[in-house]
């Protein structure tokens, strides 16, 4: 193969890789600033990067939470927070092990573990069931919950 053709192919492959990485990054929410507060309790969320959760609305606006339990309080009862009727585009929580945003609807949550969040007992978010079950065994977690299994009664107080 001619060197010029090979260089063109390599360049195109690199551009495709960069574009796919940029598209993946574009799907993630913006990180909170030092002014963003939890939409439920009012805490400054940037102080707790390992616990941040966020809801992104279709208009591009976001609300942040200092942990999954406040995230679920808001998501399950939006009328309490004057959010009823707002159209949700994406839901994110911070994966406990990876400390990166993951899609909340595909994450698993461990209730009743010995790990505390910024405000005490917390639902611990993990990116998949296997990691959630391992975490529950290692940290005395009582129950592994899929996103749709979290109800107001299962949110720690």
Briefly describe each language-model feature range:
Residues 84-147, 153:
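Thiol/selenol-based redox catalytic cores and closely related redox-interacting motifs
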Residues 1-6:
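N-terminal secretory signal peptides that target proteins for export/translocation
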Residues 26-84:
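N-terminal secretory signal peptides
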Residues 21-25:
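Sec/Tat signal peptide C-region and signal peptidase I cleavage site
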Residues 9-20:
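Bacterial N-terminal signal peptides
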Residues 7-8, 53-54, 114-115:
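Short hydrophobic/aromatic segments of transmembrane alpha-helices and their interfaces
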